[in-house]
Amino acid sequence: HQAQRLYEMAISQAEITKADTVLDLYCGVGTITLAMAGAAGKVIGVEVVPQAVEDARDNAVRNGITNAEFFCGDAGQAALELEKSGVRPDVVVVDPPRKGLNADTIEALHRMSPRRIVYVSCDPATLARDVALLKERGYTLKTAAAADLFPRCAHVETVCLLVLRNPVTHINIDVDVEEMVQDKRGMATYGQIKDYVLERSGLKVSTQSRYHAVTGI
């Protein structure tokens, strides 16, 4: 029952559409991959254990699922190879062992920039570490829920959703104040600030109150 609940949470958080490609890293025998196949345009599973990959392919055939592919290899290295070949998943599911994601996997996720990452974890410590690394790469932790797959012990399975921040609404602008007010007396005017931001970023400052909220000026 708890395993079914975990899969339902992962599917719900992924918010998959028929236009989406889903990449499932550390997919095992393809349980989560195949559970998402019906809602997605295409699903891709990656697993390092050869027999598990064969079982995943057999499970797809037995269930009449034709939009699933499975690859055998290290999750991080395989993800980097898929990225180099042009694969750009909309949703990525990761279900790593207790040691969490390796550096290659973090880098692959950063390069692929899926809009959603569903992280299934069996170790809260490595989960916290990896979430912090993904936040540095543009993701926001939206939800976290627990599933008691290990009753009568301290271990817990956690399902987290990380969402890519909108690059249009989150832009870092390096402002050289000295350059902005060079040859000007006193503080820069609001008009000068708007012109400077427009020149440097192509964005229009819509309201003075928004600028004040950010800068205090």
PLM regions: where:
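DNA-recognition alpha helix
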Residues: T189-S201, H212-G216
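Rossmann-like S-adenosyl-L-methionine
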Residues: H1-G186, G191
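Residues in the helix-turn-helix
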Residues: S209
